[in-house]
Amino acid sequence: MGWYFLLAAAGLDLLLPFLLAPFYPGYSHRRQVMSVLGSPESPVRWVYRVWLVALGLLLCAATPDLWAAFGNRSPVLTGLLIAVLCVFALGAGVLAGLFSVNADKAVETAASRIHGVGSVLGFLALAFAPLLVALLAFRDGAGGAGVFSLICFALDVCCF
């Protein structure tokens, strides 16, 4: 069941901003971060904020299946991968959903600081997921998946 949670979380997280943007006049994917969809000024704020909390919960709910699939092969790497996923889920998901940013960056509140710190820590942790997946893949003899994951990690580092 956890694999379905992962697929649902990834798919909806990619689609939802594009589905919500038309309902927020003036919102631009090019000029604004997705978090603005959850700002107090946004007409779709509740949908987006509830989604972020649900995203975090879905990702955390997927971790038992990750452990079942890889924990017996490499408990340390699997534990690190689960930790990285949970830090992202709680920081960029749950905390970001509970505490909103303002549409105007000049206005800083305690909520926007919590949102920012949670998101930064979450995405920083998630940046290491492809490296951990690569190590797990190489350990299992899946060289192609390992190389692909290393390429993703390299792109991640270059673009972060």
Regions found by a protein language model. Give the residues of each.
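Hydrophobic, aromatic-enriched alpha-helical segments typical of multi-pass transmembrane helices
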Residues: M1-Y27, V33, L37, E41-F160
